[in-house]
């Protein structure tokens, strides 16, 4: 995307934190690099996050925050992306994404949450954030 989530994360990072962003769309990569010159943005699939962690000298990361539209992805793409996330996260690491209340009951969204449960030790959903338009919830998972 264009950095709405990134904009919220950066001010809350620890001083010693390393932050990388993954974006597959070249136009969005350009926007992100212009908006956030202090971070590293890779033009690649999030499924390849482990490769970029290794380039940083890190085997794993503490957390992954995703703004991907999971309910609209094929099962194969969901699997590839989630497998990359699991490989990238340290034991106990956290994965977080969001869903809109309108897509939460969709069969593909239900299947996505089942995929999370199959890969993570703990999965949960926050309360509905009614101030968001459209209302949304955060789905989180602990490795």
Model features per residue range: what roles?
Residues 32-33:
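Conserved SAM-binding loop
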Residues 38-51:
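Conserved SAM-binding strand-loop segment of SAM-dependent methyltransferases
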Residues 2-15:
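Conserved SAM-binding loop of SAM-dependent methyltransferases across substrates and taxa
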Residues 107-143:
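Class I S-adenosyl-L-methionine
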Residues 25-26, 45:
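Conserved SAM/SAH-binding beta-strand->alpha-helix loop
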Residues 52-63:
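A short acidic, Gly/Pro-enriched loop at the edge of an enzyme's catalytic core
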Residues 89-99:
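Conserved beta-strand signature within the Rossmann-like core of class I S-adenosyl-L-methionine
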Residues 79-91:
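A short glycine-rich, Lys/Arg-flanked "PGG" loop and its adjoining helix->strand segment in the class I
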């Amino acid at each position: 995307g264009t950095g709405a989530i990134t904009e919220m994360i950066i001010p809350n990072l620890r001083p010693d934190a390393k932050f990388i962003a993954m974006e597959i769309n070249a136009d969005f990569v350009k926007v992100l690099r212009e908006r956030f010159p202090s971070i590293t943005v890779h033009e690649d699939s999030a499924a390849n996050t482990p490769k970029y962690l290794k380039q940083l000298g890190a085997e794993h990361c503490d957390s992954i925050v995703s703004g991907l539209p999971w309910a609209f992805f094929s099962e194969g793409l969901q699997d590839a992306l989630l497998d990359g996330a699991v490989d990238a996260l340290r034991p106990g690491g956290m994965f977080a994404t969001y869903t809109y209340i309108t897509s939460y009951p969709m069969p593909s969204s239900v299947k996505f949450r089942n995929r999370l449960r199959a890969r993570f030790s703990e999965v949960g959903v926050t309360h509905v954030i009614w101030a968001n338009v459209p209302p949304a919830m955060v789905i989180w998972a602990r490795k």
